[in-house]
């Protein structure tokens, strides 16, 4: 299995059970060490991750969907899979090249020799890797330093973005104005209460929880609340979480790229989520 493929699994596991930011930190470390290219790092960072199961239950509970949490989260997985299949083939992800960080050597994994036993080959590779690994103390110290540096550096930014976005969403018409094109898209998809749901869809770029807060506190159609809740998880790029970590990391993505990725994921996922929601609430 290649480093890029194994990192996809590590990233998904860390995201499902912990936090999406942990997956990005793993990706960034592997990228800097030369295990894969800029293109691989970017795709892994913005495609192969889901909001953690615990936080997904928080969103489902906020919207009153805990009784249908399995189809709720299954819809997230289906829409996210569609995004992962399409996103690497469109802008901006298709612009990145197979170059390494600071031109370090690209550490490609060895292929299994013809006729060799896969288990024995993998076991020998694991033993060799373990023999060169740092001590447990070094691993813990380096991991602690990385986490502290990441979260202390991000905490002020996260609080600032979250507070500002909530103020703008609740007390100004900014999101209502910029979401007018989204209203027409929702109406085309025959989603009820389109004018109320549209601002919640765009505000997801700032924080994943704000869309659910906005639609749960109003008399919006239940199916529309389901669509907004699932979409807020599937959008994946939030300035108060994954977006901030990506911008702080060495992965070659800027704010413009993140916003385009956010919009692209929304465009891909929205019709899929809507179709599934219409079946669930038929």
Where is each model-derived feature located?
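Residue-level signal for the membrane-embedded core of alpha-helical transmembrane segments
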Residues: 18-21, 77, 155, 159, ...
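Membrane-interfacial segments
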Residues: 34, 90-99, 168, 172-176, ...
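Intrinsically disordered, low-complexity non-transmembrane regions of multi-pass membrane transporters
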Residues: 2, 93-146
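Short, small-residue-biased leader/transition segments that mark boundaries at the very start
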Residues: 2-9
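C-terminal transmembrane helix pair
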Residues: 30, 34-87, 208-282
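Transmembrane helical segments that form the transport core of multi-pass membrane transport proteins
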Residues: 1, 128-220
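Helix-loop-helix module between adjacent transmembrane segments
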Residues: 9-18
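Hydrophobic alpha-helical segments embedded in the membrane of multi-pass proteins
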Residues: 18-22, 50, 177-185, 204-210, ...
């Amino acid at each position: 299995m290649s480093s890029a493929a194994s990192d996809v699994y590590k990233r998904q596991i860390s995201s499902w059970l912990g936090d999406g930011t942990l997956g990005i930190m793993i990706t960034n470390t592997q990228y800097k060490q030369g295990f894969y290219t800029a293109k691989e790092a970017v795709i892994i960072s913005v495609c192969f991750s889901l909001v953690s199961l615990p936080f997904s239950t928080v969103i489902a509970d906020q919207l009153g969907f805990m009784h249908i949490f399995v189809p709720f989260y299954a819809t997230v997985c289906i829409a996210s899979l569609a995004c992962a299949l399409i996103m690497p083939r469109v802008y901006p992800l298709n612009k990145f090249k197979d170059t390494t960080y600071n031109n370090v050597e690209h550490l490609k994994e060895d292929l299994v020799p013809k006729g060799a036993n896969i288990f024995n080959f993998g076991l020998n590779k694991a033993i060799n890797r373990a023999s060169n690994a740092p001590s447990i103390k070094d691993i813990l110290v380096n991991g602690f330093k990385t986490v502290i540096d990441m979260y202390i550096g991000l905490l002020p930014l996260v609080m600032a973005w979250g507070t500002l976005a909530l103020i703008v969403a609740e007390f100004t018409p900014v999101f209502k104005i910029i979401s007018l094109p989204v209203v027409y898209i929702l109406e085309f998809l025959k989603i009820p209460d389109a004018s109320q749901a549209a601002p919640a869809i765009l505000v997801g770029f700032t924080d994943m929880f704000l869309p659910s807060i906005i639609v749960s506190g109003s008399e919006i159609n239940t199916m529309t609340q389901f669509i907004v809740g699932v979409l807020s998880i599937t959008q994946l790029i939030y300035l108060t979480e994954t977006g901030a970590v990506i911008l702080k990391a060495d992965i070659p993505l800027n704010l413009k790229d993140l916003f385009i990725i956010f919009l692209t994921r929304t465009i891909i996922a929205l019709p899929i989520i809507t179709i599934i929601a219409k079946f669930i609430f038929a």
